[in-house]
């Protein structure tokens, strides 16, 4: 009787359980009819890796120098994903990553589950191999442990063998090591926390598969398998390598390529074997300024013992990507997407937000009034562009076409304090308000080649009267309530502003998006003041940030 009651109530309870889960207005891969459309993650989760634990799936991705780092996403069906946490609160050494270190830090992590614990390994190309652990992937992770010091070691992945021994595979960054396209394996201590063996080259793709990197190490039916990309980010392909010995030699086969599809460079990712006996492969697709989005492909083991990924005809040994396919078998019907909008009502930042460097509490904090306060941070004395500013609060772009609107109050104590919204990358553009005397100047701030020393320029668009003025005798502020908006379509961003939230005016010319260093363009907030400032800081109170069509 009890089971019958539960079975009757379950369809009613499931929507309630999912009520707190985020649904995107701009991209949802679940088609609602048992199929999905790629990408399953339409945002910059580059170099993805995933692990299955029972009927749950956990994914992480490269975070480079963005903080918090190592995002943790959860899914019940490999299609519907949500952000549940981060494994890295700050980058070490803290003082080095206290300022932006674009393109450095966490490269191509691997997530694994071993004896009741989750492990994430990654290579920092300037420092070595690191690992963090957790029993709950959505909870607290340990502080990073350095498994191996070294230069150029990237794209690391462990394997615990049947005899309890632990091995680590890695690729090499040519920019640091002076060579690439080589994969090496070495033995770790059984707990996986330190290297005890010397590296051996197990594969050199230099002549036939250039830019071999991003390896993931598995074992199946007595075979050791290396899944790795080759050919480069934009135009590469996916390899599978196998050997009866962990140290090789390995034979290689291409198992996924672009083929006749528009999906360039379908490679680097994770083989996932589900509790329902199915095999799937998650990989990225480079979309320039939008970053590297994540696709899901079916994977099949053929009679000759080799896998084929994606769509392949009879007798073909290499597949090409599906744009649409049936969903993996799952007991879950929940539709959920990674968070984008934020009302700032919960007392903590949404998990979609990251800083450009290790966070300083002086940069900002949530308020009891349901806002995110962002204080004007001191720009460096040698300021050229916001490429140097760690306090940018940013998130990934959620789709190719979307609108992002922020409602905020800017409060200024002194001249030349400024803040607003920004579309950030190696070229960037921001729509800001700056105090000048007793008024605010609406300005577009633009920079080309920020990564190579480009200098920010300012264009004043309008003069705006304050919404409110303090009457206190000590350090009075003037305040401006304003709505700022970005509309993105086809790689172009247009800016708008409004003082009432209903009537928006265009603010300046169109801006062409450009990616950051190894990451896609990002959007969010900026709040700054000159390095010479000595008085009280100004601030943004961001009431909300909403992503819509």
Model-inferred region functions:
Residues 7-15:
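Bacterial N-terminal signal peptides
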